[in-house]
Amino acid sequence: MLNKKDFLKYASKLAFPIMIQNLIGTLVNIADTVMLGYVSQTAMSASSLANQYTFILFCLYYGMATGTSVLCAQYWGKGDKKTVERILGLAERISLIVSLIFFVISFTMPVTVMKIFTNSPDTIAAGSEYLKVISFSFMFMGFSQVFMSALRSIGKIMLPSITYIVSLCVNVLCNATFIFGLFGFPKLGVTGVALGTVIARITEVFICLIYSLNSSDVRFRIKYFFAKSGILFQDFMKIATPAVINDVVWSFATSAFAAILGHIGDDMVAANAVAVMVVNIGAIACRGFSNATTIIISQELGKDQIDTAGEYGKRMLRITLAVSLIGCVIILAIRPLILDFYRDKLTETALSYLSIFIIMTTWRLVGEGINTCLICGCFRGGGDSRFGMIVDSIFMWLVAVPATFLAAYVFKLPPVWVYFVMTLDEFEKMPVVFIHYFRKKWLTNITRDFD
C-alpha cells in the first residue's frame, strides 16, 4: 500500500490528464458555438438540436466505456493481459453495431429525426444536412472512445490526452476552414462543422491504430473482435447497461429541470445557462479524480487487495472533497468578474439571478463531487453500476424533479427559492449513498479465470 504522499502523486498523475481531456471537450463545444454564431442563429440552433440525437449515442458510448474501463482495470490488476484484449475486442464490436444503427437512422431519416426536436422549416433543413454528414463520424467515434477508455483503465493516460489535443486542433482548424471558406474551400456553414467533426474523429482512430500496432501493452486484435465472448459478454453488459440507464435517467432529469425553469421565464433560463457553464468548468477537476478513482479501485480489486482498495477509496473521497472545496473558492473568487462580463449581456433581473445562482451551484458542487466519487468512482470500480442507476432513478424522478415542480407551480415560490430546491438533488440522495459506501459490498473482485 502506498503512503499518503506517494498515493496523492499517483492519483494526481492519473487525474490531471483526464481533467485536460474533459477541458478540451468543453473547449471544442465552445469553439463550435462561437464560430457558428458568425454564421446565423439558425445554424446554431440546428447544430444544437441535432446534437440532442448524438447525445443519446454519447450516453451509450459512456456506458460501453464504463464497462470497458472497469473490466480492463480489474483484469489488468490481475495480470491477465489476454482477457484485457478480449474485452477491448468485444467492446469495439458492440460499439460498431450501435454506431451503425445510429448511422443508418440519421443518414436515411435526418428530417424525421429533426422534426422530433423542432417544427421550424429552416432549422430542420440545416439540421438535416448536419446530421447526414456527422453520421459518418459515429463509427470512428465509437472506436476511439472505447480504445481510449481501455488505455486509461490500465494507467496509460498520456495517449488519450495527446489524441484529444490533436483532435481539438484538427477540429477547430477544419471548422474555421469550412465555415469561413479559408484556403480556397467553399463556405459550408453548419455542414462544415459536421465535416470538421468527421475529420477529427478519423484522426483519433488513426492515432489509436498507430499506437495499437506499436504497443507492447494492449493491442486491438481483429481475432478478438470476431471471437465468441460468452460469459465475458454477460459481465460486460452487467456493468455497461446500468451505467447507460443511469446516464439517460440523469440527463432526462436535467432536461426536466431546464423545462421547469424555462416556463418560469427567459431570465431564469439565461442565468441558469451561465451558472451551469461556470460550475461545469469547476467540476472538471472533481470528475477527473472520480475517473481516477475507478481505475485505482478496479486495479486493486483485480489484485484481490480488498482492504487496500477500501483504503484507497477513502483517500480518494477526501481528495475529491478537498478539490471540490477549492473549486468552490475559485468560482466564488471570480464571481464578480463573471457578473461584470455579463452586465451588458443580461437583463438586470437575469443578472441578479445569476449572482445568487453562482453561489448555489458552487455549494452543490461539493455534493456532486462526493456523490460522483462514490457512485461513479468507488462503486463502479467494484463493478457495481446498478446502485447508481437505482438511486438516481428514485431520487431524481421521485424526489428532486417533483419537488422542483411543486415549488414552482403549486407553492409558487419566488424563482430563487425554486432554484434552491432544484440544487438540493445531490444532498437528498447522499445519506443513502454513504450507507451503501460503509456497507462495503461494492468491494468485489469480478474477474474470472480463463484458459
What are these regions (language model features)?
Residues 1-15, 72-137, 185-241, 297-364, ...:
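Short alpha-helical transmembrane segments in multi-pass integral membrane proteins
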Residues 18, 22, 33-34, 70, ...:
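Transmembrane alpha-helix boundary and packing residues in multipass membrane permease domains
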Residues 23, 27-45, 114-121, 177-188, ...:
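Helix-terminus/linker motif at the lipid-water interface of multi-pass membrane proteins
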Residues 44-107, 141-160, 258, 271-335, ...:
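Small-residue-rich hydrophobic transmembrane alpha-helices
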Residues 65, 134-153, 160-168, 193-208, ...:
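Short runs within selected transmembrane alpha-helices of multi-pass transporters and secretion channels
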Residues 120, 156-157, 265, 384, ...:
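Short loop-to-helix capping motifs
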